[in-house]
Protein backbone atom coordinates (compact mmCIF):
# COMPACT_ATOMS: atom_id res chain seq x y z
CA UNK A 1 0.00 0.00 0.00
CA UNK A 2 1.57 3.21 -1.11
CA UNK A 3 1.36 6.44 0.83
CA UNK A 4 -0.42 9.27 -0.85
CA UNK A 5 1.58 12.43 -1.43
CA UNK A 6 0.44 15.39 0.63
CA UNK A 7 -0.81 18.02 -1.71
CA UNK A 8 -1.10 21.75 -1.04
CA UNK A 9 -4.91 21.51 -1.07
CA UNK A 10 -4.85 18.85 1.64
CA UNK A 11 -2.61 20.98 3.85
CA UNK A 12 -4.82 24.02 3.28
CA UNK A 13 -7.96 22.02 4.11
CA UNK A 14 -6.39 20.69 7.31
CA UNK A 15 -5.28 24.16 8.34
CA UNK A 16 -8.73 25.60 7.61
CA UNK A 17 -10.48 22.92 9.66
CA UNK A 18 -8.13 23.33 12.61
CA UNK A 19 -8.53 27.12 12.57
CA UNK A 20 -12.31 26.72 12.37
CA UNK A 21 -12.24 25.05 15.77
CA UNK A 22 -9.40 27.07 17.28
CA UNK A 23 -10.79 30.52 16.42
CA UNK A 24 -13.85 30.30 18.74
CA UNK A 25 -11.63 28.90 21.48
CA UNK A 26 -9.19 31.80 21.16
CA UNK A 27 -12.03 34.35 21.16
CA UNK A 28 -13.58 32.69 24.23
CA UNK A 29 -10.26 32.83 26.08
CA UNK A 30 -9.85 36.52 25.24
CA UNK A 31 -13.37 37.29 26.50
CA UNK A 32 -12.77 35.34 29.72
CA UNK A 33 -9.49 37.18 30.28
CA UNK A 34 -11.14 40.59 29.81
CA UNK A 35 -13.97 39.60 32.15
CA UNK A 36 -11.47 38.52 34.81
CA UNK A 37 -9.58 41.83 34.50
CA UNK A 38 -12.85 43.78 34.82
CA UNK A 39 -13.82 41.79 37.92
CA UNK A 40 -10.37 42.40 39.40
CA UNK A 41 -10.77 46.17 38.96
CA UNK A 42 -14.28 45.95 40.40
CA UNK A 43 -12.98 44.10 43.46
CA UNK A 44 -10.26 46.72 44.03
CA UNK A 45 -12.88 49.47 44.03
CA UNK A 46 -15.11 47.31 46.22
CA UNK A 47 -12.31 46.87 48.76
CA UNK A 48 -11.64 50.61 48.82
CA UNK A 49 -15.29 51.35 49.50
CA UNK A 50 -15.48 48.55 52.07
CA UNK A 51 -12.47 50.05 53.88
CA UNK A 52 -14.18 53.44 53.90
CA UNK A 53 -17.30 51.94 55.46
CA UNK A 54 -15.38 49.99 58.05
CA UNK A 55 -12.95 52.70 59.12
CA UNK A 56 -14.56 56.14 59.05
CA UNK A 57 -17.56 58.03 60.31
CA UNK A 58 -20.65 57.84 58.17
CA UNK A 59 -20.63 61.42 56.93
CA UNK A 60 -17.13 60.93 55.59
CA UNK A 61 -18.08 57.54 54.21
CA UNK A 62 -20.96 58.97 52.22
CA UNK A 63 -18.86 61.79 50.81
CA UNK A 64 -16.04 59.46 49.83
CA UNK A 65 -18.19 56.74 48.32
CA UNK A 66 -19.80 58.98 45.71
CA UNK A 67 -16.82 59.35 43.33
CA UNK A 68 -16.43 55.57 43.09
CA UNK A 69 -20.03 54.87 42.14
CA UNK A 70 -19.81 56.52 38.74
CA UNK A 71 -17.34 53.91 37.55
CA UNK A 72 -18.93 50.70 38.79
CA UNK A 73 -21.47 48.22 37.51
CA UNK A 74 -24.80 47.11 38.96
CA UNK A 75 -23.18 43.94 40.32
CA UNK A 76 -20.79 46.14 42.28
CA UNK A 77 -23.72 48.08 43.73
CA UNK A 78 -25.32 44.79 44.82
CA UNK A 79 -22.09 43.79 46.58
CA UNK A 80 -21.93 47.21 48.20
CA UNK A 81 -25.47 46.79 49.51
CA UNK A 82 -24.46 43.47 51.09
CA UNK A 83 -21.44 45.07 52.78
CA UNK A 84 -23.52 47.92 54.10
CA UNK A 85 -26.13 45.56 55.53
CA UNK A 86 -23.43 43.99 57.71
CA UNK A 87 -21.64 47.24 58.54
CA UNK A 88 -22.65 49.45 61.40
CA UNK A 89 -21.04 52.05 63.60
CA UNK A 90 -19.33 51.31 66.90
CA UNK A 91 -21.39 51.52 70.06
CA UNK A 92 -21.12 55.01 71.51
CA UNK A 93 -19.24 55.49 74.77
CA UNK A 94 -21.38 58.39 75.91
CA UNK A 95 -25.16 58.12 76.18
CA UNK A 96 -25.96 61.29 74.22
CA UNK A 97 -28.10 59.86 71.47
CA UNK A 98 -30.00 61.63 68.78
CA UNK A 99 -33.47 60.23 68.17
CA UNK A 100 -32.59 56.56 68.39
CA UNK A 101 -35.79 55.35 66.77
CA UNK A 102 -35.69 57.87 63.94
CA UNK A 103 -34.30 56.66 60.63
CA UNK A 104 -32.53 59.10 58.34
CA UNK A 105 -32.62 58.85 54.56
CA UNK A 106 -29.96 60.58 52.47
CA UNK A 107 -30.39 60.96 48.72
CA UNK A 108 -27.22 61.52 46.72
CA UNK A 109 -27.69 62.47 43.09
CA UNK A 110 -25.14 61.02 40.67
CA UNK A 111 -24.79 61.33 36.92
CA UNK A 112 -26.15 57.86 36.33
CA UNK A 113 -28.75 57.67 39.11
CA UNK A 114 -29.53 58.18 42.78
CA UNK A 115 -27.84 56.64 45.80
CA UNK A 116 -30.15 56.19 48.79
CA UNK A 117 -28.57 55.71 52.21
CA UNK A 118 -30.88 54.69 55.06
CA UNK A 119 -29.74 54.42 58.65
CA UNK A 120 -30.01 55.57 62.26
CA UNK A 121 -27.77 57.97 64.13
CA UNK A 122 -26.51 56.24 67.27
CA UNK A 123 -24.48 59.21 68.48
CA UNK A 124 -23.26 62.45 66.94
CA UNK A 125 -20.45 60.59 65.20
CA UNK A 126 -21.71 57.03 64.76
CA UNK A 127 -24.29 56.00 62.19
CA UNK A 128 -25.76 52.52 61.79
CA UNK A 129 -26.32 51.73 58.14
CA UNK A 130 -29.51 49.83 57.46
CA UNK A 131 -29.64 49.85 53.69
CA UNK A 132 -27.98 51.43 50.67
CA UNK A 133 -29.65 51.22 47.29
CA UNK A 134 -28.79 52.61 43.90
CA UNK A 135 -31.42 53.48 41.31
CA UNK A 136 -30.10 54.15 37.80
CA UNK A 137 -31.69 56.96 35.81
CA UNK A 138 -34.03 55.82 33.08
Curated annotation (Swiss-Prot):
Its main location: membrane. It is found in: Membrane. The chain crosses the membrane at residues 11-33. It comes from the Bacteria. This is Uncharacterized protein aq_850. Keywords: Membrane, Transmembrane, Transmembrane helix. It is a single-pass membrane protein. GO terms for cellular component: membrane.
